[in-house]
Amino acid sequence: MKKALLTTILALGIALPSDAALAHHGWSWTTGENLELTGVIKKVRLGNPHGILQVEVAGEMWTIEVGQPWRNAHAGLKDGYLAEGVEIRVIGEPAADRSDRRLKVERLFLGDREYVLYPDRD
């Protein structure tokens, strides 16, 4: 009985996300206000839980979080559109800690085309 209880407790501990992971996901880490940035994509990592772009903006590197694969696809955004060397304009919520230089995208623009990832946010 004790072994089963210990196994259950350990399994739950492994399955539960860390405080850092919980704090990072969602919008609680952002300012709640929008910021617009334009820059050049330097690095791309797409996939779950969400895509990450490294974008050079006015000589500074920003971490830009795009949506989950299903959200990007729903907005009409194809993975191949987000590539190194592509100029991108993003509107979204920056990290409350501005020194983090991280932004969660609500809308992004590639050329003249707009992709709305979070239509219920402004």
Language model feature labels by segment:
Residues 21-35:
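Short boundary/loop segments of OB/S1/cold-shock single-stranded nucleic-acid-binding domains
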Residues 39-41:
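Conserved hydrophobic positions within beta-strands
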Residues 47-56:
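Short aromatic-glycine-enriched beta-strand elements
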Residues 60-69:
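A short macromolecule-binding patch
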Residues 74-90:
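Short nucleic-acid-contacting surface segments enriched for D/E, G, S/T with interspersed K/R
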Residues 95-119:
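OB-fold/S1-family single-stranded nucleic acid-binding modules
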